[in-house]
Structures are given as C-alpha cells and as structure tokens.
C-alpha cells in the first residue's frame, strides 16, 4: 500500500505505558500491563487500539503470550503495535505493523488486513482518513469515506493489486464472480485489476449500496 506501515490479518498494535516530564517509561517498568486483555484486543482487532494509545507517554513493551510475540511502542506523539506467531505454523506468517499519528489534522489510522485463508500473509499497508465522500484519485466517482477505508485496507488503493492466494483483484479486491455481477458489460469476464479506476469505483459503490459493506472482510 502507499503509506508507511504494514498490516496483515495476524498483525496488530498496542500501546501501554504512561509518561511524564523528565521520565520515560521502559519495558521493564510495565509490570502492570494486562497481557491477557491486550492480547485479546489484538487478536480481535479492537478498533480502540488504532484510535488511541492505551496509555499516555513514551513506552516500549515486548512480551510473549499464548504463542504470539507482542510489541508496543510510542515516542509520546505516535504509537505502533504488532505481533507475530511464535509457534511452528504450517504456513509462514510475516509480521506487520500499524501506526497512528496524533495531529490536529484528520487522523490517519492504519489497520490490519484480514485474510480468510491459511496461506502466507502478504505485506500491505493501510491508511484510512476521516473525511466526507469525495472522488478517488484518478476517478470522478464519489466514494464514501467507509468505502475509501475498505479500499485502503484491501489494496492500499492500488487499482492493479492482485491477491495471489485468493485471486481477488483490483482496488477493492473483487472476486471475479462478484465483479461480474456489478461490472459494466464490457468488463464482465475481465480481471478487475485491468479496469480503469472509475469503473472499479462505480462497481464498488454499486455493490456497497445494494449489499452493504459485508462483502469485504476488512469492513
């Protein structure tokens, strides 16, 4: 994707540790961290982890819990979190990160991308912006902010993206059968990744308006 951080279905981020003037919290000082609660939030991709750090101040926390290795850090203004499996899995899993910047401007939030297979997870980036409906870059189609977030989580906004494991393609990672049900006649049977961005946007808006966001696992 086109932002700085990586996200996958097995990657999360947490931030825990208070900080105050003249004193930075270190991992050794975070004995009050509720590992079970943080791990559960990570595994369920609790949105609160992307919206704010769990405590104020700088921190750097690492721990292993129930077969996963967790990492959380913050410099006091930005925070990141990630985890990766420490078990011997049948398929390799690549860790990824998610980072949120605290600014006066619209907050940029990254979130893990969900995969519904046991295939190797591919690295991707994800950034969502809180904004009103607007036209996508290179497209005159008005796409609502939720659908923009879905596109970022699915492909990072790459209209030519193709998932090698599932075959999903395009900006919104359409499966071919789903694409054929909403695409214009001249693009039916054609890979979504080969269609112009405006065509992909219209198809996604049509699918969203008729069936809701449930067609995307990252919604």
From Swiss-Prot:
<dbReference type="GO" id="GO:0005576">
    <property type="term" value="C:extracellular region"/>
</dbReference>
<dbReference type="InterPro" id="IPR023346">
    <property type="entry name" value="Lysozyme-like_dom_sf"/>
</dbReference>
<dbReference type="GO" id="GO:0016798">
    <property type="term" value="F:hydrolase activity, acting on glycosyl bonds"/>
</dbReference>
<dbReference type="Pfam" id="PF06737">
    <property type="entry name" value="Transglycosylas"/>
</dbReference>
<keyword id="KW-0964">Secreted</keyword>
<feature type="signal peptide">
    <location>
        <begin position="1"/>
        <end position="27"/>
    </location>
</feature>
<keyword id="KW-0378">Hydrolase</keyword>
<comment type="similarity">
    <text>Belongs to the transglycosylase family. SceD subfamily.</text>
</comment>
<protein>
    <recommendedName>
        <fullName>Probable transglycosylase SceD</fullName>
        <ecNumber>3.2.-.-</ecNumber>
    </recommendedName>
</protein>
<comment type="function">
    <text>Is able to cleave peptidoglycan and affects clumping and separation of bacterial cells.</text>
</comment>
<feature type="region of interest" description="Disordered">
    <location>
        <begin position="86"/>
        <end position="143"/>
    </location>
</feature>
<keyword id="KW-0732">Signal</keyword>
<dbReference type="InterPro" id="IPR010618">
    <property type="entry name" value="RPF"/>
</dbReference>
<keyword id="KW-0326">Glycosidase</keyword>
<feature type="compositionally biased region" description="Low complexity">
    <location>
        <begin position="89"/>
        <end position="140"/>
    </location>
</feature>
